[in-house]
Amino acid sequence: MNNFFDVIIIGFGPTGGTLASLLAKSNLSILMLEKEKNLYPLPRAVHFDDEVMRVFETIGIKEKFKNYTIINKGTKFVDNKGNVLLDWPRPKEITENGCYPSYRFHQPDFERVIRNNLKSYKKFKSIQNANVKKIINSKDFVKVVFQDTETLKINIFKSKYLVGCDGANSITRKSIKSKFSNLGFTQKWAVIDLILNKKKNLPDRTIQYSNPKRPATYCRNVGKRRRWEFALKKNENEKKVLTEKFIWEFLQPWLKPNEAIIERKVIYTFKSAIANKWRKGRVFIAGDAAHLMPPF
């Protein structure tokens, strides 16, 4: 493999994959470095809008990927007694971007589609198990030193430019001495993803439960997938919150344990933050490496 590329991208998630597709379409040589060996199989991101679908059309995956999506019908905000505070239906018409205004998706489906599409570009190369150790940002090129997580072999590649799409704990951001500025929002929420094994009369749109004791969100996702998110109370025990007993007690108004399986359970700290510098010389950051925002 050639060890010099137009652009090296660190991180093969949605941001890195989309950027690689745009650059490869422009006939640039791209090297993708990804720390993980395999695609992460569980739900994460679940929503995008018409502007994003327009980008997917640009990179040539819209027709393939739309079969893995559903149109998001909108959101209702209800109080703790179930009274509707706000009904926000999404328009059913195609927008000026030529797409519907809101979509639901399963992130692993998207990553499979975009990775398969990138295989058609001869100038695109990817390396898995690549744990980046050092980024050297010089006047004429960028040098990346990474270690294979299985063989422990050290590798060095160079490029004209480098973009770090390597998440909130970005080594790329640290390499350019960029720091996050906290914009004042920090909350812990549990995110519970489930797969229904029985037909249930659940809402066909997003519901925001505006309960001051425990705000929560319900998402109607693709296929049989459903998601509930709820805020943790101050000093609440995180391990206890993620036990099946606690989860099924929370879900009791909507589901019984024999009606679905828990696919994923995790606690996120939702933050609002922005990096004070997105570029230094030939090195850039993008996605969560550059900014963090709550999901709603």
How should each PLM-predicted stretch be described?
Residues 116, 161-271, 275, 279:
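Conserved FAD-binding catalytic core of PHBH/FMO-like flavoproteins
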Residues 11-21, 33, 114, 164, ...:
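Conserved mid-domain beta->alpha element of the FAD-binding
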Residues 1-15:
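Beta1/beta-strand and adjacent pyrophosphate-binding region of the FAD-binding site
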